[in-house]
Curated annotation (Swiss-Prot):
Residue list for modification N-acetylalanine: A2
Compartment annotation: Endoplasmic reticulum membrane; Vacuole membrane
One GO cellular component term: endoplasmic reticulum tubular network
A Pfam short name: Reticulon
Name listed for the protein in its UniProt record: Reticulon-like protein B3
Segments crossing the lipid bilayer: 75-95, 97-117, 186-206
UniProt keyword annotation of Transmembrane helix present: yes
Any GO BP: response to bacterium
Region of interest (Disordered), residue spans: 1-38
Membrane topology: Multi-pass membrane protein
Biased amino acid composition, Basic and acidic residues: 1-25
Keyword vocabulary terms for this entry: Acetylation, Endoplasmic reticulum, Membrane, Transmembrane, Transmembrane helix, Vacuole
Organism domain of life: Eukaryota
Length: 255
């Protein structure tokens, strides 16, 4: 009887192990299915301009990104305030850059010189003027990044000029036309200041209302693509049909 009882217990243990093993496998498979579904949902979310990284990483992920996205409000406000004061001085008050630099330098050097000279008479320690130098690695990084961006711009311009992508060509022409109109209505300094203000406001507002902006951008892109298809059928296809095919063959051979 004892052996039969042990045999029944071993059978029950095997059955329970199989049941628990099936539950574990089913739960793990369901978890993996949930992970896959959540991952697929994440990939389906539309991001403006096909963005795949957070906005902070797109700005470099360092101190410049913290400044533009107002992670440090004092520094961001100071930079924007300095840009505003500079624009007021040079644009509204029509102050000359060299004149301003000369006056500030004269005032600063005079104060430092008088304080250092008078410190021995008033029995106070002279001012400690720190050494100022530009690190070489920072300059090399900036130069390397600027070189890469300039070369990338040259590559894009070459592709556009070669006649391979008519859509990109029309977009660039429209952008340059808008830029020329804006440049004719305001000078270069005002344009730089407007770009600075936009750089300090649009990214942080976009980060705050990201989902709403992306949803609106998705609808806008659908409408733009729809209008472009109609424009392509009604206008571009007719224009391209009138251009001799030998011209494009000549361009391809030249490339």
């Amino acid at each position: 009887m004892a052996e039969e009882h042990k045999h029944e217990e071993s059978i029950m243990e095997k059955i329970s192990e199989k049941i628990h093993g099936h539950d574990d496998s089913s739960s793990s498979s369901s978890d993996s299915d949930d992970d896959k579904n959540s991952a697929s949902l994440k990939t389906k979310i539309y991001r403006l301009f096909g963005r795949e990284q957070p906005l902070h990483k797109l700005f470099g992920g360092g101190k410049p990104a913290d400044i533009f996205l107002w992670r440090n409000k004092k520094v961001s406000g100071g930079v924007l305030g300095a840009a505003t004061v500079s624009w007021i001085l040079f644009e509204l008050l029509e102050y000359n850059l060299l004149t301003l630099f000369g006056h500030i330098s004269i005032l600063a050097l005079a104060v430092l010189f008088l304080w250092s000279s008078a410190s021995t008479f008033i029995h106070k320690s002279p001012l400690h003027i720190p050494e100022v130098h530009i690190p070489e690695d920072v300059v090399l990084q900036l130069a390397s990044g600027l070189r890469i961006e300039i070369n990338r711009g040259f590559t894009v311009l070459r592709d556009i000029a070669s006649g391979r992508d008519l859509k990109k060509f029309l977009l660039v022409i429209a952008g340059l036309w808008v830029l020329s109109k804006v440049g004719s209505s305001c000078n270069f300094l005002t344009l730089i200041y407007i770009a600075t203000v936009l750089l300090f406001t649009i990214p942080v507002l976009y980060e705050k209302y990201e989902d709403k902006v992306d949803d609106f951008g998705e609808k806008a892109m659908r409408e733009i693509k729809k209008q472009y298809v109609e424009f392509d059928v009604k206008v571009l296809s007719k224009v391209m049909s009138k251009i001799p095919k030998g011209a494009f063959a000549f361009i391809k051979k030249k490339d």
